[in-house]
């Protein structure tokens, strides 16, 4: 497998790993991270800065779903009891094209062991000035219509002063099994309709009715990141662990976690053979003095 692919211009530097189709880390050219720093040691996708979610995102309770007259099964793909985050993040991707400003990766799931999906996924990561753009496409290569979902799992640095704005209309509580519970109004403590600090407690929730825009500010490094996501990503997953306050995740998703189990295949995108689902999001980095 090739080594990390480095993307670089006069504003940003980014490393990409074919393993997991993951972004390893990302920083400004003067060394300020806007994605989680990787650190030392061998590559581990769970220590990376971003990985793709395909053909579904998050967990599938019960590891199965019904579609038509068929029952389709998933197999757990980690030590957890449920199939989680799809196949792409655990797979080796092929570098199809590469330059200093972009890389195209592809992954073929022709003989699935853990899921019933047969597909081709393509990820295109590019730099343009102070903007990183990530695009993910999945094409159904199976013999029948199947539910597909896509998303990204980016990890951002978290400092004591980190502030977030990401307006949404509602959220899902969390229940046992790290699964969504009930859809309710967003509590004041997690209302990010205006720029505010992350609460000093654990968050692991899906926010729906998202505008596709978010802003992160790191006062300590005088840096800001503006996120824009395609309309297919109408919700985001926010994960901020209580025991490790060095990072948080804000991941665009095309469907609610556990939607296959709760709402059925129609809650995802039903792709006929040959059909494609695609979506992109971007991160634009800028200097920020507003909290100095």
Predicted regions and their residues:
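Glycine-rich active-site loops that engage anionic ligands at enzyme catalytic sites
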Residues: 218-257
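Active-site/ligand-binding surface loops and adjacent short beta/alpha elements
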Residues: 74, 146-147, 155-230
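Short Pro-Gly-centered flexible turn/kink motifs
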Residues: 65-73, 136, 269-287
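Short, Gly/Pro- and small/polar-rich lid/capping loops
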Residues: 1-10
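Short, hydrophobic/aromatic-enriched beta-strand segments in well-ordered soluble domains
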Residues: 16, 105-107, 125, 216, ...
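Acidic-aromatic substrate-binding/catalytic surfaces of carbohydrate-active enzymes
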Residues: 15-71, 77
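Extended, loop-rich substrate-binding clefts of extracytoplasmic carbohydrate-active enzymes
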Residues: 70, 75-129
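Acidic, contiguous internal or C-terminal segments within carbohydrate-active enzymes
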Residues: 7, 107-148, 152-156
């Amino acid at each position: 497998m090739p080594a990390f692919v480095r993307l670089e211009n006069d504003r940003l530097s980014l490393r990409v790993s074919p393993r997991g189709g993951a972004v390893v880390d990302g920083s400004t050219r003067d060394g300020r991270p806007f994605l989680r720093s990787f650190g030392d040691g061998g590559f581990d996708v769970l220590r990376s800065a971003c990985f793709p979610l395909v053909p579904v995102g998050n967990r599938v309770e019960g590891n199965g779903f019904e579609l038509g007259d068929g029952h389709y099964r998933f197999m757990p793909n980690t030590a957890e009891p449920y199939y989680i985050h799809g196949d792409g993040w655990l797979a080796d991707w092929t570098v199809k094209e590469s330059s200093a400003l972009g890389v195209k990766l592809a992954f073929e799931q022709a003989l699935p062991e853990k899921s019933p999906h047969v597909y081709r996924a393509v990820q295109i990561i590019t730099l343009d000035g102070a903007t990183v753009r990530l695009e993910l496409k999945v094409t159904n290569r199976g013999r029948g219509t199947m539910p597909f979902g896509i998303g990204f799992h980016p990890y951002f640095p978290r400092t004591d002063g980190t502030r977030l704005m990401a307006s949404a209309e509602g959220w899902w509580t969390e229940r046992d099994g790290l699964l969504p519970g009930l859809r309710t109004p967003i509590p004041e403590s997690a209302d990010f309709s205006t720029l505010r600090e992350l609460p000093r407690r654990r968050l692991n929730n899906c926010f729906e009715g998202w505008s596709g825009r978010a802003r992160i500010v790191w006062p300590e490094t005088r840096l800001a990141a503006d996120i824009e996501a395609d309309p297919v990503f109408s919700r985001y997953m926010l994960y901020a662990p209580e025991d490790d306050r060095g990072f948080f995740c804000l991941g665009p998703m095309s469907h609610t976690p556990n939607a296959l189990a709760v709402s059925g295949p129609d809650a995802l995108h039903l792709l006929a053979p040959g059909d494609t689902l695609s979506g992109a999001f971007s991160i634009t980095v800028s200097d920020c003095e507003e909290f100095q």
